[in-house]
Amino acid sequence: MAELKNDRYLRALLKEPVDVTPVWMMRQAGRYLPEYKATRAQAGDFMSLCKNHELACEVTLQPLRRYDLDAAILFSDILTVPDAMGLGLYFEAGEGPRFERPTDTIDAIKKLSIPDPEDELGYVMKAVSTIRRELNGAVPLIGFSGSPWTLATYMVEGGSSKTFEKIKKMAYAEPMALHMLLDKLADSVILYLNAQVANGAQSLMIFDSWGGALSHSAYREFSLRYMQKIIDGLTRFADGRKVPVTLFTKGGGLWLEAMAETGCDALGLDWTVDIADARRRVGHKVALQGNMDPSMLYAPIPRIEEEVGHILAGYGEGTGHVFNLGHGIHQHVDPEHAGAFIKAVHAQSKQYHK
């Protein structure tokens, strides 16, 4: 593998000195870019794009051609794992992801098998190795998965949900069934992420998009417990370097201390968290990633630059901060505004790394 030319993202996650604060954007390969839309049209639909390793590589690299980003993230979807379990993933126009066969009974859960990442998910591994080769050491490659709880919400609900009624009913009326599902998902995610590292991923991220829907105690029981199991099972060294792991629970500001105890290297913060407060609470243990409101990219460029300065000042001096949005970039954002955001992070952060 080519030697890494820009490792500031990995260094910041491990709280090693950097020259400027590294920056990347969740969903940086996405619909706000005209070149992404053209490639997606070429693929036919979203999952065809994910399953074609050459096109998945192309869209992963597109934002790096435009912007001075400090990391690339694998272009894929969190629902690849349940899809590989045979649930029949499809996308309904305007409805988002759906499953033909929801996992909403204990019998359905018992029948689930753990997918082989090199077989049923081989297309993801091919994408990882292709992207790593094509990056040629320019920046690190981030691999990722959804958290067991978040994957389970889609599997039990049969798709997206605003109320999470079915999975919460299972959690409280049939907790053993849900624990069986979460356990299988944790085992699947461990294999999946370790295979991504074996194929070239240099950092890992676990997206717990719906952990914030849980009560204070239920979060620990049904989400954090299984992310802990994953972290305990991950490959943490490859190519002679540590493979940093970032946990991100959207709406997880209540639980930063508990998340920091898992042994992860960094916590992702959504835009509702004050980064200065987060650093006071857990900055001695973990790095922090975040956390500008993605909607701020609709603001005039001087306002974006002002907000970048505010967040950098909130974190303060020294390493341990990876700048990002608090969630994925919106599809109608002007690419110029995204570019101004990235430039502002690098330009304004030098003063914090003397």
UniProtKB/Swiss-Prot annotation:
For this chain, the annotated S-S bridges are none
Residues bound to substrate are 27-31, 77, 154, 209, 327
In this entry, which stretches build a coiled coil? none
Keywords attached to this entry: Cytoplasm, Decarboxylase, Lyase, Porphyrin biosynthesis
Q: Major place of localization? A: cytoplasm
A GO BP entry: protoporphyrinogen IX biosynthetic process from glutamate
- Record has Cytoplasm as a keyword: yes
| Gene name in the database record | hemE
**What is the designated name of this protein?**
Uroporphyrinogen decarboxylase
Native species: Shewanella baltica (strain OS155 / ATCC BAA-1091)
Q: In which pathway does it act?
A: Porphyrin-containing compound metabolism; protoporphyrin-IX biosynthesis; coproporphyrinogen-III from 5-aminolevulinate: step 4/4
Catalytic activity, as annotated: uroporphyrinogen III + 4 H(+) = coproporphyrinogen III + 4 CO2
Gene3D superfamilies tied to this protein: 3.20.20.210
Q: Where is this site: Transition state stabilizer?
A: 77
**One Pfam family from the UniProt entry?**
URO-D
Per UniProt, subcellular location reads as:
Cytoplasm
As for what it does, the entry says:
Catalyzes the decarboxylation of four acetate groups of uroporphyrinogen-III to yield coproporphyrinogen-III.
Known EC number(s)? 4.1.1.37
GO cellular component term, pick one: cytosol
